[in-house]
Swiss-Prot record:
Superkingdom, natural source: Bacteria
Signal peptide: none
InterPro entries (UniProt xref): UPF0145_dom_sf, UPF0145_YbjQ-like
SUPFAM superfamilies from the UniProt entry: YbjQ-like (SSF117782)
HAMAP family in alphabetical order: UPF0145 (MF_00338)
Protein name stated in the entry: UPF0145 protein jk0060
Family: Belongs to the UPF0145 family.
Record-linked Gene3D superfamilies: Hypothetical protein apc22750. Chain B
PANTHER family membership: UPF0145 PROTEIN YBJQ
Length: 105
């Protein structure tokens, strides 16, 4: 399946716009990772623990979106956007991926 942030796919003609599809996931960052990230923030380093959690959450949201598009017979998803939202003070992050499921001629 072709998944792109653009509104068209070079070499393909969109036959039908099916509907908006999305995938969401919530990632929780645990206390031990928070402590390590806090230390890295003080010393100016990057927190690979947080980066890994965010990467995994993004991949999960994208996979969920693709699975929903496949269920409706889509050949691709165009106009994909990935958003990140902090949920409260508890270290929770929601990642959502949205796009338009399409078929190609």
């Amino acid at each position: 399946m072709i998944v792109t942030t653009t509104n068209n796919v070079e070499g393909h003609t969109i036959g039908q716009y099916l509907r908006i599809v999305s995938g969401e996931t919530v990632a929780g960052i645990n206390m031990f990772k928070d402590i390590g990230a806090g230390f890295r923030n003080i010393t100016g380093g990057r927190s690979s623990a947080y980066e890994g959690e965010i990467l995994q959450a993004r991949e999960t949201a994208l996979k969920e979106m693709v699975d929903r598009a496949l269920e409706m017979g889509a050949h691709g998803i165009v106009g994909v956007d990935v958003d990140y939202e902090s949920l409260g003070q508890g270290g929770m992050v929601m990642v959502s991926a949205t796009g338009t499921a399409v078929t190609f001629q």
